[in-house]
Regions:
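Intrinsically disordered, low-complexity segments enriched in small residues
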Residues: 1-81, 85-209
Length: 209
């Protein structure tokens, strides 16, 4: 979990993890732990959650990430799904989920990997669209093929209930205003760096047909 206001994060083990089914179940469990149904969607304490299921990286086509938050559209719990590299980047960062709380003091980019968390001031990107932002973040965070870059445009910056989160240029968390939630946290971008390795369990290898 990352606290943007404090500028620090930690790796935590979630009690009850095994009773949650898939990325959607994990995201809901994390919102129960970190979120509040009483507070408004743009309260800094409300979490922005990115979660994957147990088969990601182990079984073909399990490549979606679940983004969960309290929606600016109807002020209720919501989730949106996206493809791209985000799910595998989380897996290779040795994370089942990323939980972001708080509000950064300046427009910022959050970078996370298997051994690091970094929050960088990117005020100069505020106002840029997702394409210009993506080009700049790719230069700032090399490692094509191993990292996933999530970012918002001007609609997200103003908290629009229709703003999505762009993922690796061609994919989107497109439903229910996740981009507005990022903007409310002063978060212009998130870079997930899949910089670790994991091995398949020997007794779980799936033979080719």
């Amino acid at each position: 979990a990352v606290d943007l206001a404090a500028g620090r994060g930690s790796v935590q083990t979630l009690e009850g993890r095994n009773r949650a089914v898939g990325g959607s179940g994990l995201a809901a469990l994390l919102f129960e732990a970190f979120g509040s149904v009483e507070r408004p969607w743009d309260d800094p304490g409300q979490p922005l959650i990115f979660a994957i299921g147990p088969l990601t990286g182990y079984f073909p086509l399990m490549s979606k990430t679940v983004c969960a938050f309290k929606s600016p559209y109807h002020d209720q719990y919501a989730e949106s799904h996206a493809g791209g590299r985000s799910a595998l980047a989380l897996r290779f960062a040795d994370l089942d989920a990323l939980v972001v709380t708080g509000r950064a003091p300046t427009p910022s980019c959050l970078a996370v990997g298997s051994h690091h968390i970094e929050l960088q001031d990117v005020h100069y990107l505020w106002g840029q669209d997702v394409y210009a932002t993506g080009r700049m973040l790719r230069r700032m965070y090399p490692g094509a093929g191993h990292r996933s870059i999530l970012r918002i445009g001007p609609a997200g910056e103003i908290g629009s209930a229709m703003a999505g989160i762009n993922v690796d240029t061609y994919r989107h968390f497109g439903r229910l205003g996740g981009g507005g939630v990022m903007g409310a946290k002063n978060l212009k971008g998130i870079v997930i760096e899949g910089d670790a390795a994991f091995s398949l369990p020997a007794d779980k290898v799936i033979p080719a047909p």
